[in-house]
Amino acid sequence: MSDNSKTRVVVGMSGGVDSSVTALLLKEQGYDVIGIFMKNWDDTDENGVCTATEDYKDVVAVADQIGIPYYSVNFEKEYWDRVFEYFLAEYRAGRTPNPDVMCNKEIKFKAFLDYAMTLGADYVATGHYARVARDEDGTVHMLRGVDNGKDQTYFLSQLSQEQLQKTMFPLGHLEKPEVRKLAEEAGLSTAKKKDSTGICFIGEKNFKNFLSNYLPAQPGRMMTVDGRDMGEHAGLMYYTIGQRGGLGIGGQHGGDNAPWFVVGKDLSKNILYVGQGFYHDSLMSTSLEASQVHFTREMPEEFTLECTAKFRYRQPDSKVTVHVKGDKAEVIFAEPQRAITPGQAVVFYDGEECLGGGLIDNAYRDGQVCQYI
């Protein structure tokens, strides 16, 4: 058995069960483990309660239980500058951003990784459900987590080869119930703590209220594609392509009772387009354009790739042809796709391997740009 005691692994600990078990497994495998709690957001609520303080207490309890040193580090400025400003700019531009992708790229695997290196880390580890496989020449491949329902490679798709070289994902070969069981067997205080949801580091706040603190709402008209006025919308930033709830129109406008969906936006005129039917024509597209395209391994400047892709988290893979030129790509779908949303990530896969991805700029229907921004 190899001696891991000389290998230092710095674990990003959130106070949740996944990162707790990550630290536990590495400690059991004999690594020199240090736990780090990242404070990335000032989340004091109206009652003066800071959930980060509660989470840090959980980190302290687990670190003490498994016998590892721990520290807290503040990345609020980095998060604001690198993730939150981007998040607001995307909403201003009528897009629907995915802050978790940017948070992993800029905070968890950049600011945190850089900090870990100052502590003498050989690797960093997180509680993400993903796997890394290392070739003999040192190349690292990022693979899907074994738990298909929890696989998080979609959110890790912007990581570079250099970042992956320094990363371990100890939970990648486990399913979520197994992780909880390990936590319970070890008597970890976080064993029954519920999973966090909501925006990366912002938590479970009411999204509409939260966003209105930073961006002024700009109500406008809600129209059908053929020009019928359906009332007022609350502000384009509150709606995403393909959304059903929150429109307030129901079946009161005559015709059939099929549900209404957001089928388009016009930022220049502040119009929200709505239509009836899950597969409304305006929601379907045959290709997309992406920018900030990036691969986890070295690739040529220009090439064509046949692979599968995801256009949102937990979506089944779809067959695509990808024409890459620099950091841009045209992605052509084998079958029409529904609600391709500007600002979201498109992520490429070859079987189990996550190859990388980009951010969706526009969707096209038979060569015509869809009115989604």
Swiss-Prot record:
Protein origin, superkingdom: Bacteria
Subcellular location field: Cytoplasm
Enzyme Commission no: 2.8.1.13
Gene Ontology biological-process entries: tRNA wobble position uridine thiolation
Keyword Manganese found: no
Keywords assigned by UniProt, alphabetized: ATP-binding, Cytoplasm, Disulfide bond, Nucleotide-binding, RNA-binding, Transferase, tRNA processing, tRNA-binding
Site entry (Interaction with tRNA), positions: H128, Q344
Active-site residues, Swiss-Prot/TrEMBL: C103, C200
Positions of region (Interaction with tRNA): 150-152, 312-313
Top-tier EC class: transferase
Database matches in Pfam families: tRNA_Me_trans, tRNA_Me_trans_C, tRNA_Me_trans_M
Region described as Interaction with target base in tRNA: 98-100
Single GO MF descriptor: tRNA binding
Binding-site residues, ATP: G12, M13, S14, G15, G16, V17, D18, S19, M38, G127
Catalytically driven reaction(s): S-sulfanyl-L-cysteinyl-[protein] + uridine(34) in tRNA + AH2 + ATP = 2-thiouridine(34) in tRNA + L-cysteinyl-[protein] + A + AMP + diphosphate + H(+)
Gene Ontology annotations for the cellular component aspect, listed alphabetically: cytoplasm
Keyword tRNA-binding: yes
Cysteines engaged in disulfide bonds, as pairs: C103-C200
Family designation: Belongs to the MnmA/TRMU family.
HAMAP family in the cross-refs: tRNA_thiouridyl_MnmA
Protein's job: Catalyzes the 2-thiolation of uridine at the wobble position (U34) of tRNA, leading to the formation of s(2)U34.
Protein name: tRNA-specific 2-thiouridylase MnmA
Organism of origin: Streptococcus pneumoniae (strain P1031)
Name of the gene encoding the protein in the UniProt record: mnmA
